[in-house]
Curated annotation (Swiss-Prot):
EC number: 1.8.1.2
Name of the protein: Sulfite reductase [NADPH] hemoprotein beta-component
Pathway where it operates: Sulfur metabolism; hydrogen sulfide biosynthesis; hydrogen sulfide from sulfite (NADPH route): step 1/1
Annotated source species: Baumannia cicadellinicola subsp. Homalodisca coagulata
Cofactor descriptive note: Binds 1 siroheme per subunit.
Species classification: Bacteria, Pseudomonadati, Pseudomonadota, Gammaproteobacteria, Candidatus Palibaumannia
Amino acid sequence: MNKKIPKAILSDNERLKVASNFLRGTIAQDLQDNITGGFKGDNIQLIRFHGMYQQDDRDLRVERTCQKLEPLINMMLRCRLPGGIITPQQWLGIDSFATKHTLYGSIRLTTRQTFQFHGVLKPNLKNMHKLLHSLGLDSIATAGDMNRNVLCTSNPVESVLHQQVCNYAKMISEHFLPKTRAYAEIWLDGEKTETTEQEPILGANYLPRKFKISIVVPPLNDVDLHANDLNFIAISNLGQLVGFNVLVGGGLAMTHNDKSTYPRTASELGYISVVDTIKIAEAVITTQRDLGDRSNRKHAKTKYTIERVGVEFFKKEVEVRAGIKFKHIRPYSFTERGDRFGWVQGIDNQWHLTLFIENGRIIDDSHRKLKTGMLEIARIHQGDFRITANQNIIIAGVEKKHKATIELLARQYGLINNNITLQRKASMACVAFPTCPLAMAEAERFLPQFVTKVENIMSRHGLGQEKIILRVTGCPNGCGRAMLAEIGLVGKTIGRYNLYLGGDSIGTRIPRIYRENLTEEEILSIINDTTGRWARERQPDESYGDYVVRAGIIRPVINSALDFHN
C-alpha cells in the first residue's frame, strides 16, 4: 500500500495557490476592470477562497450571445456562519442587501448551514463584503481548498449541550481560518503590510481540496455527518459535553462514468476528551494536508487519502501529530435525521419554531411572501435564528409571551402551512440552474412539482402520512446530498437523471444506482412500483430504503470503494 503522495505533476490549482501571494492574485486589479463583469485567469479560482463563485445566468446565455454580449456574469457569495447562528440585526442587514443589490432578490439557505447571495454584480462586491463586516460576518474560506463552514446540530432543546457544541463549532471555524490578510486588504481596504506571511496550519499551498467538518448530537443526524471529512459526535454525561467520537473520510462527490470516484461514509477513529478537540482537528487536517493527492483533484479529498493509506495508518498519524491516543468509541446511535418542525420547548423554557423553507429559497412570489415574513419577524424577535443543514430556519429563543405574535406573522406570510406533507419536508435539492455552472439538469426548480407527483403516488398507495428521504442534485458533486438519500436523483443531462435507491432513513448508508439516464416519467413509474410494494410488503416501522434492500430490489452498498459501482 502506497502511503506517500504519488509522484506526478501537480494540478494547476497547486500552481495558482502558491503563485497567488497568499490568495491575493490580481483580484484587486480585476475589480478595477470595467470592460468585463467577471474576473480573469487564476482569479476565477482565487475568489473562491474569499467565499465567492463566478457564475452567469444560464437562462440568458443564448439571448446574450445573439446580442453579441458576454454572459451575464455575477457572483455567488456564501457566508461563514459556524453552526448557522445569525441574529435578527444581521438578518435585517442581509435582507436589505439581497433586495437592493442582487439580481434575484433572494436569500438562499444552504446545506452548509449558512446563506448565499446569488446574482451580485462586480461593482457591488466590495460594498457587500463591507456590509458583512459591519454586521460581524464574513465569507472567508467558505469555498476553495479550505476548511468550509462548520456544521453543528440545530437542536436548541438540549439548551446547555447545544450551546457547548455550538461554541466548539465556532472555535474550530476560527482556528482554521487562513492567516493571510488578503481578504481584509482587498475587500475592506485594510492596510497593506510588508511582513512575511505564513500559514502554519494550512501551508502556503493550502489544502489539497475542500475540507468539511460537522458536529452532531445524537440521536438526531440532522447534519448528515457522512457527507463530511471530519465529524465530531457529541458524547454527554448528565447533559454536559464530555467528549467526542471522531469519524473521518466521509464525502459524496463523484464523477459520472469514472469508477475511481465514489461517495464514502466516514470511518471511526475513536473517542477523545472534549479538551483535545482542537488538537485532534488540527492533526487530522495537517495529515490530510500532507498526504492528500495534489496531482489529481478528483482524488484529493480525505476519503481517497483514507482509502489509499488505510484507516489505521491515518489514525496513527493523527495520534502522533496530536500527541493523543484515541480511546474506544463510546456507544452512540441515530434514530432520525432532518429537522423537527413546529414549536418545541427547550429545557431552559425558551421556545423554538422550526420553519420549512422549500429548497431554502427565501423570496417573495405570487403565492407567499417568505422574505417579507422573515423581515417582519426579524424586526421584533429578541432571540436568534438558526439556519439548519437541511435548508430550513429556526426562530430560536422565543419567550412564551411572544409565541403568539411570532406564529401569527409566520402564518400571515406563508412561513407556516399546515398542508405541507411529511414527504415535502423530507425532500431537498441543490440550486442547479440557472446560476450553477456545473449543473447538468434542473434541481431546485424541478423538485416542487416532482414532489407533488410523488405525493400523489404515495397517497394512492395509502402512504400519505409516510415519508421517503428524497434528494435531487443537478450534477454528481453532491451539494444536495443525494448520495445519502433513500431515493436520490443525480442530473445527467437536461431532463434526465441517474436514479439511486437504498440509502437509509438515518443517513448512514449510501444508495446504489438503480437505472441510468431516466426521464421524469420513467423515474415516477419506478417510484410507483416500488412504493406500491413497500405499502403491501413492509414490516412494522420499516423505512422505504430498508425495504428495497430487504426485498432485493437493490443491493446495499457495504464498502463503496469496492462495490459502489458494481
